[in-house]
C-alpha cells in the first residue's frame, strides 16, 4: 500500500496568501486574539492537525477526563500569525512560523502553561492536576 507523502517540511498552514495578506493582523491584535481564545475554555490547546506531539497532548488531556478547546492552527486562516505570536510568548527567537517545535501550546485557566515539555513536566511532578482543578477542568 502506498501512503501519501506529507510534503510539509514547514508549517505553511494555508496556501491562500491573499487571505493572509488581507487580514492585516498586527501583533497586539494577535495577542488579544490569543487571550480571547485562551479564555474560552478551562483548557485550550493551540495545535497543528498533523503534529504527533499535538496529538499526544490532546490524548493526555482527554485521557484525564478534560475536554480542551483545540485550535488547529493549520486549519485557521490566521494560524501563521497566531503561531508567530505564540513563539514570541514562549521566548523562541529562532524558527519563525516555519518551526513546529513550539507546538502544542497549552493554556489552563487562561494562563499559558507552555509547550509539550512544560506540560509533561507538570504532569510528571504532579502539579498538572491541581492546575486543572483550580481552572475547573477537573472535578475529582
UniProtKB/Swiss-Prot annotation:
Main location as per UniProt:
cytoplasm
GO BP annotations, alphabetical order: negative regulation of DNA-templated transcription; negative regulation of transcription by RNA polymerase II
Q: Looking at the Swiss-Prot or TrEMBL record, what is one Pfam family this protein matches?
A: Glutaredoxin
Which tissues carry this protein? Answer: Weakly expressed throughout the inflorescence apical meristem and in young buds. Localized to the tapetum and middle layers.
Disulfide bridge partners, by residue number:
51-54
Instruction: Pull one GO CC term from this UniProt entry.
Output: nucleus
The superkingdom of the source organism is Eukaryota
Question: Does the record bear Disulfide bond in its keywords?
Answer: yes
Alphabetically sorted, this entry's keywords are: Cytoplasm, Disulfide bond, Electron transport, Nucleus, Redox-active center, Transport
Effect of gene knockout: No visible phenotype. Defection in sporogenous cell formation in adaxial anther lobes when associated with the disruption of GRXC7/ROXY1 leading to fertility defects.
The protein's location, in the record's own words, is: Cytoplasm; Nucleus
List residues of the Glutaredoxin domain.
31-139
Motif Responsive for interaction with TGA factors, residue range(s) on this chain: 137-140
Kindly indicate whether the keyword Nucleotide-binding belongs to this entry.
no
Family listed: Belongs to the glutaredoxin family. CC-type subfamily.
* Function statement: Has a glutathione-disulfide oxidoreductase activity in the presence of NADPH and glutathione reductase. Reduces low molecular weight disulfides and proteins. Involved in flower development.
Give the multimer and partner information: Interacts with TGA9 and TGA10 in the nucleus.
NCBIfam families the record matches: GlrX-like_plant
The entry's protein name is: Glutaredoxin-C8
Natural source organism = Arabidopsis thaliana
Amino acid at each position: 500500500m502506498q501512503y501519501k507523502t506529507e510534503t510539509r517540511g514547514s508549517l505553511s498552514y494555508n496556501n491562500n496568501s491573499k487571505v493572509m495578506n488581507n487580514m492585516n493582523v498586527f501583533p497586539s491584535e494577535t495577542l488579544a486574539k490569543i487571550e480571547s481564545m485562551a479564555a474560552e475554555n478551562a483548557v485550550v490547546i493551540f495545535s497543528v492537525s498533523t503534529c504527533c506531539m499535538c496529538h499526544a497532548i490532546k490524548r493526555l488531556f482527554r485521557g484525564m477526563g478534560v475536554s480542551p478547546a483545540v485550535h488547529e492552527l493549520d486549519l485557521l486562516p490566521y494560524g501563521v500569525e497566531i503561531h508567530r505570536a505564540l513563539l514570541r510568548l514562549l521566548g523562541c527567537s529562532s524558527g519563525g512560523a516555519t518551526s513546529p517545535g513550539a507546538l502544542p501550546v497549552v493554556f489552563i485557566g487562561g494562563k499559558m502553561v507552555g509547550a509539550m515539555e512544560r506540560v509533561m513536566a507538570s504532569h510528571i511532578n504532579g502539579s498538572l492536576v491541581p492546575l486543572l482543578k483550580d481552572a475547573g477542568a477537573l472535578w475529582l
